[in-house]
Design a protein with these regions (language model features):
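N-terminal short beta-loop-beta anion/metal-coordinating cradle
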Residues: 16-55
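Short beta-strand segments
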Residues: 38-40, 62, 96-100, 162-165
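A glycine-rich, hydrophobic loop/mini-helix early in the fold
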Residues: 43-73, 77
Length: 181
C-alpha cells in the first residue's frame, strides 16, 4: 500500500462532507485573507496547524528553510499581479515569511554535507551556503528585505516576518508588515 493511501481515504471523506468547500475564495488564486505564506517544508511547521489557516484563506509556499529564492520571488510577483489585475479595489496583499527554530536546513552549514549535496543535484554550492536557518530572526529579516527590494514585486504587496518556536509552539512577529521602499 502507498504512503498516501490513508490520505486519499480522508480526501474521499472530505469531498463527500456537506459544506466541505464552503468559504472558498470568490476568485481563483486570491485567498480570502489576501495572504501568501512562505515557510519551511519541515513537517512540524504546517500553517494549517500552527496558524489555524483554513482552506481558501492563504496561498502557502514551502521550501527548504522557507527561504526566499528567485523562484519564490517570481511566484509572489505572479500572485501580486493577479490581485492587482483581478481585485484592484481590494486591500493590500501580504506575504508572511515564517522561519522556525531547530530547522533541518542547518545541516547545509556543514561544508562536507553541503558539498556532497551540491554535487548530487548540480547546484551552486555558494547558493546552498546561504540557505541554512541558523538564526531564524536574522534570516527572516534578510528574506523580508529580499522580497521588498525585488523589482518584480508589485506595490500592493506588504511583507512581514515571523519565527515559529517548535519547542513552545509560539509564533513571534519579527518584522511587522511593511511595503516596498
Amino acid at each position: 500500500m502507498s504512503n498516501i493511501a490513508p490520505l486519499l481515504d480522508r480526501n474521499r471523506a472530505f469531498a463527500s462532507a456537506p459544506g466541505a468547500r464552503q468559504g472558498m475564495p470568490r476568485l481563483p488564486f486570491i485567498p480570502t485573507l489576501n495572504l501568501y505564506i512562505v515557510t519551511c517544508i519541515d513537517c512540524r511547521v504546517d500553517p494549517a496547524q500552527i496558524l489555524g489557516v483554513k482552506l481558501g484563506e492563504a496561498l502557502v509556499q514551502r521550501n527548504i528553510g522557507g527561504r526566499i529564492t528567485p523562484a519564490v520571488i517570481r511566484d509572489i510577483a505572479y500572485a501580486g499581479y493577479l490581485v492587482d489585475t483581478k481585485a484592484p479595489e481590494g486591500p493590500y496583499f501580504e506575504v508572511a515569511i515564517v522561519h522556525h527554530t531547530d530547522c533541518g536546513s542547518t545541516l547545509l552549514a556543514d561544508d562536507e554535507l553541503r558539498h556532497g549535496f551540491a554535487q548530487r543535484i548540480g547546484a551552486d554550492e555558494r547558493t546552498l551556503a546561504d540557505t541554512p536557518v541558523l538564526d531564524p530572526a536574522r534570516t527572516v529579516r534578510t528574506d523580508v528585505e529580499r522580497v521588498l527590494w525585488a523589482d518584480e514585486i508589485p506595490e500592493n504587496v506588504r511583507v512581514s516576518g515571523h519565527v515559529y518556536d517548535v519547542g513552545t509552539g509560539v509564533v513571534t512577529t519579527i518584522v511587522d508588515a511593511k511595503g516596498r521602499k
